[in-house]
Amino acid sequence: MKSLFRPMIVIFAVLAALTGLAYPAVMTAFGQTVFHNEANGSMIAKNGKVVGSRLIGQQFDAPQYFWGRLSATSPMPYNAQGSSGSNLGPINPALADEVKGRLAALQAAGHQPAGVAVPVDLVTSSGSGLDPEISPAAAAYQIERVAAARKMNVSDVAAIVDRYTRGRQFGVFGEARVNVLELNLALDDAQRG
């Protein structure tokens, strides 16, 4: 009986050391040396102060800023601790109310492009409720409002949007997108500079 326990204990100790200590230590060292920024949350700093992450959206509702997707987290928007599945079904009355509320906010802000449908990502939330990016169509839809609020030329704001529009990942995966935080920070810099 004793002869059975010794190999089990040795195997347990070896696997615990490998999977609980060695593997996490190697992966942490690899992440910190090769992917330092990503391993630490892809933080964005301005003037030595962290202002956000490229990976988690932030609440912007002032007219001089581009607005991101709706956040479905609670008790406050873009709360990473409250992230969970948030997709409502197409016939759910709560989704219709959410869309109507966001449409009303967009109309109240003014400066909608004539004859252009509101992009769906401006009136619906993402699956996680934390999406930091919008489609180029959603950014283009807001250019006139942002330019008017900042007293900037529409073409200047459009050029900044173009500069911050990223294509598909590796040219294949996903869709083109614009990081809202990076775009808004670039607009602040352009207006100051």
Curated annotation (Swiss-Prot):
One GO cellular component term: plasma membrane
InterPro entries: KdpC
Keyword check for GTP-binding: no
Main location per the UniProt record: membrane
GO terms, molecular function: ATP binding; P-type potassium transmembrane transporter activity
Keyword annotations: ATP-binding, Cell inner membrane, Cell membrane, Ion transport, Membrane, Nucleotide-binding, Potassium, Potassium transport, Transmembrane, Transmembrane helix, Transport
Membrane topology note: Single-pass membrane protein
Transmembrane feature ranges: 7-27
Keyword Glycoprotein listed: no
Cellular compartment(s): Cell inner membrane
Summary of the function given for this chain in its UniProt record: Part of the high-affinity ATP-driven potassium transport (or Kdp) system, which catalyzes the hydrolysis of ATP coupled with the electrogenic transport of potassium into the cytoplasm. This subunit acts as a catalytic chaperone that increases the ATP-binding affinity of the ATP-hydrolyzing subunit KdpB by the formation of a transient KdpB/KdpC/ATP ternary complex.
Known partners and oligomeric status: The system is composed of three essential subunits: KdpA, KdpB and KdpC.
NCBIfam families assigned to the protein according to its UniProt record, in alphabetical order: kdpC (TIGR00681), PRK00315.1 (NF001454)
Protein family: Belongs to the KdpC family.
Protein name as catalogued: Potassium-transporting ATPase KdpC subunit
